[in-house]
UniProtKB/Swiss-Prot annotation:
The active site is at 201 (nucleophile), 256 (proton donor). It comes from Pediococcus pentosaceus. InterPro entries: Glyco_hydro_13_cat_dom (IPR006047), Glyco_hydro_b (IPR013780), Glycoside_hydrolase_SF (IPR017853), O16G_dom_2 (IPR045857). It catalyses: Hydrolysis of terminal, non-reducing (1->4)-linked alpha-D-glucose residues with release of alpha-D-glucose. Gene3D superfamilies: Glycosidases, Golgi alpha-mannosidase II, Oligo-1,6-glucosidase, Domain 2. Its EC number is 3.2.1.20. This is Alpha-glucosidase.
Length: 557
């Protein structure tokens, strides 16, 4: 891969969740003009690419992941003219913009779905999955991602349609070539406007198993797993997409691919596969999942030894053959410092810096989620009424109200630890009302710690998390060994995280403490008297001791 380095392999991506970034029209909802207003902030941070969560027209059943028109901007966010202004302003600053592409499903308010449900013979019927049930039973036992059956009965034509997410998100039938061609036409339209690529939502679910067979029953449930990931034609579809659209432009693509292994990733993003540039994998985010059949609704902490193994497996498994995406959090997860670090005031800054150090010196393209560079924390909501996320509210209804597997107090603790709303609270800009996000009531409650954690305070403090991120980004751009070097995990079973990265010349060594207690560091190859410290979250090293959440990066001669 060293001979053909692509621009996106040396880039750092910043994810913007538009609804929560900046409101400029006083309605409590972030908008495109708000993003444009902060481009200089992002440029100063040093990032190269902005990934926008969906901004298309949508009823917002799932915060924009239910699209009713792919070629119009949601009124909440502004107009197409606002988008064109944002795109031009970003390009003028040397920043690229990639769009969120959601083509596993649409909104049930999309004109084609409305026409699809009118009768059984119209030209759009086969754009979606329509099936007759078994008497009063759904066509199969699949459970939707947000709970309940993945099938919704429609009175008008007396058949069911498939929705692997909410009832307002019917799945598209990629077996239909006319449907696929319409998707490619839409993608080309955006690329011709000048966007620089796509992040593809649940893209490994676009090929379903033939016959849509029942899935194995889930624990404590009448429903089975939906058989929708890594289907038999998914690579055929993506290769066709690449040939028809992606290969015609100098862009970057990243696919959200739940349930993949490094071996699977080579099929999606291998240098010789002609599909995607990289994938989002989630193995490291599942290590703290419940061991009692409750999935993500857990309060467990991630075991460090297991985390090191997963990261190592991906670094080694893809080296020279595919490209990693690197991230701790996004719009679907809790905040990184609360989940993998320690958000208590005594440790928040140190642990946020340590986590950043760990991630940004691995091989791959790093993704920073908005507010991560400030060390923003989980919201720690204590009332169900504070939540807006459909997944969280559906889980409470399922696990507490309907199946009564958890008490209200237990479920609230799990929501506080794992809800998607933890990462969706408004961006914390300053100490003004609503953290400077909006002068109106915000769509989601602002984290009350904004008076201590905000961008204005960070920019005024040379020792802030923000400036540490800026330094790390500069190091990535400065040292080719980060992009090109080989990865070696050191002391896999130790209670610290150490690895080397390089090609034998000016190798980099990282030493990381994932605990709030002191430990004795394992030395070995890092104890090089000629080593030069490139970055650390402590002022000076203490011999034979790693302090809470300490991080050091050395350049070895």
């Amino acid at each position: 891969m060293a001979a053909t380095i692509k621009w996106w392999q040396q880039a750092v991506v910043y994810q913007v969740y538009p609804r929560s970034f900046q409101d400029t029209n006083h309605d409590g909802i972030g908008d495109l003009k708000g993003i444009t207003a902060h481009l200089d902030y992002l440029k100063q941070l040093g990032i190269d690419v902005i990934w926008l969560n969906p901004i298309y027209r949508s009823p917002n059943d799932d915060n924009g992941y239910d699209i009713s028109d792919y070629q119009q901007i949601a009124a909440d966010f502004g107009t197409m003219a606002d988008f064109d202004e944002l795109l031009q302003a970003a390009h003028d600053r040397g920043l690229k913009i990639i769009m969120d592409l959601v083509v596993n499903h649409t909104s049930d308010e999309h004109p084609r779905f409305k026409r699809s449900r009118q009768d059984r013979t119209n030209q759009y019927r086969d754009f979606y999955f329509w099936r007759s049930g078994n008497g009063k039973k759904a066509p199969n036992n699949w459970e939707a991602a947000f709970g309940g059956s993945a099938w919704q009965y429609d009175e008008q034509t007396q058949q069911y349609y498939l929705h692997t997410f909410s009832t307002k998100q019917p799945d598209l039938n990629w077996e239909n070539p006319t449907l696929r061609e319409s998707v490619y036409t839409m993608m080309t339209w955006w690329l011709n406007k000048g966007v620089d690529g796509f992040r593809m939502d649940v893209i490994n679910q676009i090929s379903k198993l033939p016959g849509l067979p029942d899935g194995p029953l889930k624990p404590h449930s009448q429903f089975g797993d939906a058989r929708v990931t890594n289907g038999p034609r998914v690579h055929e579809f993506l290769q066709e997409m690449n040939q028809e659209v992606l290969s015609q432009f100098d862009i970057m693509t990243v696919g959200e691919t739940h349930g993949v292994t490094p071996a699977d990733a080579l099929k999606y993003a291998g240098a010789d596969q002609h599909e995607l540039d990289m994938v989002f994998e989630f193995q490291h985010l599942r290590l703290d999942n419940s061991q009692h059949g409750l999935g993500k609704w857990s309060t467990r902490k991630t075991p460090l030894v297991a985390l090191k193994k997963v990261i190592s497996d991906w670094q080694v498994g893809l080296e020279g053959r595919a490209w990693n995406s690197l991230f701790w959090n996004n719009h679907d997860t809790p905040r990184a410092v609360s989940r993998f670090g320690d958000d208590r005031p005594a440790y928040r800054v140190r642990s946020a810096k340590m986590l950043a150090t760990c991630l940004h010196l691995l091989q791959g393209t790093p993704y920073i989620y908005q507010g991560e560079e400030l060390g923003m924390t989980d919201a720690h909501f204590t009332e169900l009424a504070s939540y807006r996320d459909i997944e969280s509210l559906s889980a409470y209804r399922d696990l507490v109200t309907e199946r009564q597997l958890l008490s209200p107090a237990d479920m609230m603790a799990r929501l506080a630890a794992a809800s998607r709303d933890n990462s969706r609270t408004p961006m914390q800009w300053d100490t003004e009302v609503n953290a400077g996000f909006s002068d109106a009531a915000p769509w989601l409650t602002v984290n009350p710690n904004y008076r201590q954690i905000n961008a204005a305070a960070a920019l005024a403090d040379p020792d802030s998390v923000w400036y540490y991120y800026q330094h790390l980004i500069q190091l990535r751009h400065q040292y080719p060994s980060v992009t090109l070097g080989s990865f070696e995990l050191l002391w896999a079973d130790d209670p610290q995280y150490s690895y080397m990265h390089g090609n034998g010349k000016a190798d980099l060594a990282s030493l990381l403490q994932f605990h709030s207690r002191d430990t004795v560091p394992t030395t070995g190859s890092i104890s090089d008297p000629t080593a030069k410290c490139l970055i650390s979250n402590y002022g000076e090293q203490q011999p034979n001791k790693l302090r809470p959440y300490e991080a050091w990066v050395y350049q070895l001669a």
